[in-house]
């Protein structure tokens, strides 16, 4: 069952769910808690690889990814990152989130931003039980105008679902967890599959 605002506040109070920095009560609504945009972004460099063979040998996949991904771009508070129509960029939440082994989280973009063409997560919106770290956002601008994104703006909302029991393989205990403890806009690690 999804946690209510009262249950979210209780989970934050007793440390079952940890969100740092802790959101104020205004950020918690019926079944969700708002998250804000961090200041780190990555973009795809144009035409630096003809294609990426997602099922190719891992070394070739990684080499192609290294060619197409930018280094981390730091945007200071008060400045803006511009996402142009048709562009995909990676970003990171301002908050770090820690979940126990019996709660799964879900990230939703804001309807107000979607109505302007901004997709906050292209497909990856599940936050696994045992997750610990910041959440990477996969932004896509499907609108007609560039969008100015500023650090610490409200970018989405997390909601939480209690499972029938703890999972046997929480994310932070898995040896093959590619994004464990991520703190910045980590690029795809598909070559590690």
From Swiss-Prot:
It catalyses: dCTP + H2O + H(+) = dUTP + NH4(+). GO terms for molecular function: dCTP deaminase activity; nucleotide binding. Pfam families: DCD. The active site is at 138 (proton donor/acceptor). Pathway: Pyrimidine metabolism; dUMP biosynthesis; dUMP from dCTP (dUTP route): step 1/2. Residues 171-193 are annotated as: Disordered. DCTP binds at residues 110-115, 128, 136-138, 171, 178, 182. One of its GO terms (biological process) is dUMP biosynthetic process. Transmembrane segments: none annotated. Keywords: Hydrolase, Nucleotide metabolism, Nucleotide-binding. Its EC number is 3.5.4.13. Homotrimer. Catalyzes the deamination of dCTP to dUTP. Belongs to the dCTP deaminase family. This is dCTP deaminase. The lineage of its organism: Bacteria, Pseudomonadati, Pseudomonadota, Gammaproteobacteria, Alteromonadales.
